[in-house]
Amino acid sequence: GGGASYNLANAAGNTPSTSPSQGNNGGQSSAAVNGQEAGGGGGASAVGANGVAATAAGNGGAGTASSISGASVTYAGGGGGGSVSFTAGTGTANTGGGGGGCGYTYYGTAQSGGSGIVIIRYADTFAAAASTTGSPTITVAGGYRVYKWTGSGSITF
């Protein structure tokens, strides 16, 4: 869900409701006349933090860690809320994390979310793919075969 800006309602996450969840609610704004700080966007495993008037925008909600690639990586974190006093950051590449929001009307610029990733992992006792497109990274370790794309691609078994 998206974080709220000055005096606006935050957005709901996981709408419509699905299992597994598709994210959490965004945080509320500080709703102050001066020093409006937006709430952070909801992440995969936690709601976005509320903004604190004239102090700080809300952090994005935490993502979810997964070891499907062979190493623990956190995916789908929420973007930070916008502020009147700083420029937003971008989402981390290849994790699907949210980008930072912009501040009140004329301050700063909202930034892009992180690009996505597709990972397929299966036991290496099964045959390798017959073909792939899109130049995936392919690793075989720990009893698994892992195909990882950070752009368009396909796989045929």
Regions found by a protein language model. Name each.
Residues G1-F157:
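Low-complexity, glycine/proline-biased repetitive segments and flexible coils/loops
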